[in-house]
């Protein structure tokens, strides 16, 4: 992606010469934000795998005010399902990207989107999704079972042919595995001191604040004179 003319554009070939000369890529734009707002915590989303470059990852690692958190939708761990979804990445490309993220930002938190029961999804396809999750061990996830959306390519071309009970069972397995991995990632913070940006009063107690750390993990702690917007 290249930024020019006040918006994000994919078709750079149609840009004017002035727009081309003054354009910057997302990595540079992110760096400019980090430099001009050093006291502001910066988090961005969503990062489509095919658009997530090494340059962006390196900029994230370079500046402390850019959060070590990447939402990286995958949808499925099966190449056949990804192809049917018309996704622009393969399982192998996705895992290579994740490998590079952890290499450059070892404590990076990664979240995902996952769909169960896409048309023609087999048990093997489902197991491929579970194995990809085991490989990455995501910190968070947004998980859904497939339902037709009128007008979408999938609704026009593919029959919604997976039984609802199967969809629900597969989704339950995905959710259970994610809960296991979320606990694993949360336990990695035990014994560590992290910086938290206070966002609001805790829902569970008026005596506590709630905020998030660099990895987008929620932290709840006693108020002790702090205020919303403080870094603690």
Summary of predicted features, one role per range:
Residues 1, 73-78, 145-150, 213-215:
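Short, small-residue-rich loop/turn micro-motifs
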Residues 1-124, 134:
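Conserved SAM/AdoMet-binding glycine-rich loop
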Residues 41, 69, 140-145, 231:
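Residues at the N-termini of beta-strands
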Residues 56-57, 129, 221-222:
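Short beta-alpha junctions and helix-cap segments that line functional grooves
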Residues 72, 113, 133, 141, ...:
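Hydrophobic, well-ordered secondary-structure elements that form the walls
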Residues 84, 141, 221-222:
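Thr-Gly-centered strand-to-loop micro-motif
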Residues 124, 128-168, 174:
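C-terminal, non-catalytic macromolecule-binding modules
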Residues 154-232:
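Terminal RNA-binding accessory module
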């Amino acid at each position: 992606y290249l930024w020019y003319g006040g918006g994000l554009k994919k078709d750079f070939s149609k840009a004017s010469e002035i727009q081309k000369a003054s354009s910057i890529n997302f990595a540079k734009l992110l760096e400019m934000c980090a430099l001009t707002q050093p006291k502001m915590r910066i988090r961005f989303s969503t990062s489509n795998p095919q658009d997530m470059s090494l340059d962006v990852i390196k900029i994230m690692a370079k500046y402390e005010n850019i959060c070590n958190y990447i939402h990286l939708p995958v949808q499925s761990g099966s190449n056949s399902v990804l192809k049917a979804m018309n996704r622009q990445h393969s399982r192998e490309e996705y895992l290579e990207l994740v490998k590079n993220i952890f290499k450059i930002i070892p404590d990076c938190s990664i979240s995902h989107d996952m769909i169960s029961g896409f048309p023609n999804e087999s048990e093997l396809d489902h197991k491929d999704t579970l194995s990809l999750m085991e490989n990455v061990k995501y910190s968070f996830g947004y998980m859904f079972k497939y339902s037709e959306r009128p007008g979408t390519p999938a609704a026009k071309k593919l029959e919604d042919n997976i039984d609802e009970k199967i969809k629900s069972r597969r989704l339950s397995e995905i959710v259970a595995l994610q809960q296991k991995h979320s606990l694993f990632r949360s336990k990695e913070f035990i014994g560590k001191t992290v910086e938290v940006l206070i966002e609001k009063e805790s829902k569970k107690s008026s005596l506590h604040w709630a905020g998030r750390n660099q990895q987008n993990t929620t932290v709840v702690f006693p108020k002790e004179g702090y205020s919303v917007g403080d870094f603690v």
